[in-house]
Curated annotation (Swiss-Prot):
UniProt GO MF annotations: catalytic activity
Gene3D superfamilies per UniProt: Endonuclease/exonuclease/phosphatase
Glycan attachment points: 68, 72, 106, 256
PANTHER family documented for this protein: PROTEIN CBG08683, PTHR41349
Record's GO cellular component terms: extracellular region
Protein name per Swiss-Prot or TrEMBL: Uncharacterized protein F14F9.5
Domain of life: Eukaryota
Places the protein is found: Secreted
This protein's UniProt keywords: Glycoprotein, Secreted, Signal
Residues making up the signal peptide according to the UniProt record: 1-18
Amino acid sequence: MLIQILFLIILTLNCSYSTSYSTSNGIRLMTFNIWNSGANVENGQQKIAKHILMVNPDVVALQEVYANVTRNLTLMLGHPWVAVERNHEYPDTAILTRHVLIPNTNLSTSGAVGVKIMLRTGFMIHFWSLHLDYTSYGPYAANNKLVDKLDQIMAGENVGRGPQIYEILNLPMMKKWMEKVEDVPIFIAGDFNGPSHLDWTEQTKKIHGDWVIRWPATKELEEREFSDTFREIYPNVVSDPGITWSTVNKFNPEWNYTIPEPQDRIDFLFYKGPVVPYQILTYSGCEKPQRIPFHSKNDYPSDHFAVFADYTFI
């Protein structure tokens, strides 16, 4: 394990990525889809740990987490990193933090895990990592010329991603968290496997198959008064699209990489409560990832851009 940690430190020295932020009354959060737990690149799990160390977040929402991977990552990250994962044979979602997990507060749903965390500064947060259903991907339907009714697109949203958001919001314990949100903020982070209604607007419909769509997962969070951190800081969807899908998946392999893959913002950090965001970035390391099928030696181990944001408690 010591050799692995030294390996990570050496790799980290090669990048001058700036990660400064206030630690006294602030928090840095990250969402990171780790693409089959790093299986698609050489030394994938070591690279996952490396990039977490480079970003230096307080809490990380992970997706595509295989069994035993959080154990491996916490060992590589070292003390004081700890983890909680969804209670399932295939965890899929997990939360890493270098702060204190409050015992007996973790929650699991079909696509998410949540927990209460106490920061070493004394602040408390409620934090969710989610990974919504990947099937019936909305942008594929929206860009299909045979699709001419919104109901056809929404049919895929109403059986997977939409209900999964409702499941989280309607948990009895989540409702109790919501009652205390003026004192303890709630963060919902992860891979939504779908775009935002704030991005598919009249301004952008020409690049979205000529559709304006109120995607239900993000719309429901907005109606529950959660804020989309990226769109709050960057409200101009044309100049700041914030694409997170994909770092490497640019063309569909089934047609010899000649048909473009729709690129979209599908990884989010939502918040509600007594914090103010002041910085958010998409992240793929310092070396440009090579697209599929030339990706196996990439330094950055994911097909999604990670997203991290800094908040100040108020």
